[in-house]
């Protein structure tokens, strides 16, 4: 068994004061989330976990079930943090210095081919898919295959969470897109 650290974003509750945060924290702790730390930023609820499990996927999926089964709240996990990252966040996750990642991005190091941003590409703070950066670094011998697999699993989990969210929301019921 290993301990996995991750953060879940909760989408259907607004935390407007300390009492709201305390109430939901107590309910989570009384449930199966004694390994969680709860925080609120701009009224959004985030839950940090240090979850023991056989695999990263088991840790995350059980945490999602535990959060969503808390009595008295209809909490819904909308995403796991970390699939889209800045270079600084990618540096934290991979253990490669941000300055080195910036040189890889510019092609100064690494021979080129660094992944392109997937969001805010023309902005000051673009976002990359962590799995793309992890895979590129793995090909260069800079990170482990386990790190790449974890980044990929975050992509898959978030895709499933987003699909569930859209499927259960009437706003999207009549929209069909062919790609």
Task: Put a short name on every predicted segment.
Residues 41-46, 76-89:
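Short proline/glycine- and acidic-rich turn/helix-capping motifs at secondary-structure junctions
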Residues 34-68:
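Short, intrinsically disordered low-complexity segments
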Residues 81-104:
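Polyanion-binding surface elements
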Residues 1-14, 85:
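Short glycine-/aliphatic-rich beta-strand segments at the starts of folded cytosolic domains
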Residues 13-35:
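Short amphipathic alpha-helix segments
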Residues 9-19, 94-97:
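Short, surface-exposed ligand-recognition loops at beta-strand->loop->(often short) alpha-helix junctions
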Residues 96-126:
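Major-groove DNA-recognition helix of helix-turn-helix-type DNA-binding domains
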Residues 130-179:
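A short, Lys/Arg-enriched interface patch at domain edges and termini
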């Amino acid at each position: 068994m290993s301990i996995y650290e991750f953060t879940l974003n909760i989408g259907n509750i607004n935390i407007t004061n300390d009492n709201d945060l305390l109430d939901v924290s107590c309910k989570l702790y009384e449930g199966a989330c004694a390994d969680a730390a709860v925080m609120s930023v701009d009224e959004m609820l985030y839950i940090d976990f240090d979850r023991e499990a056989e695999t990263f996927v088991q840790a995350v999926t059980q945490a999602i079930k535990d959060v969503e089964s808390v009595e008295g709240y209809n909490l819904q996990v909308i995403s796991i943090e970390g699939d889209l990252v800045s270079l600084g966040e990618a540096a934290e996750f991979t253990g490669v210095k941000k300055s080195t990642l910036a040189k890889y991005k510019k092609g100064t190091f690494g021979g080129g081919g660094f992944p392109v941003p997937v969001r805010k590409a023309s902005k000051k703070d673009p976002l990359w898919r962590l799995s793309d950066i992890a895979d590129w670094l793995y090909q260069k011998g800079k990170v482990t295959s386990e790190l790449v697999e974890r980044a990929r699993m975050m992509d898959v989990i978030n895709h499933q969470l987003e699909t569930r969210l859209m499927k259960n929301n009437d706003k999207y019921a009549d929209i069909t897109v062919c790609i």
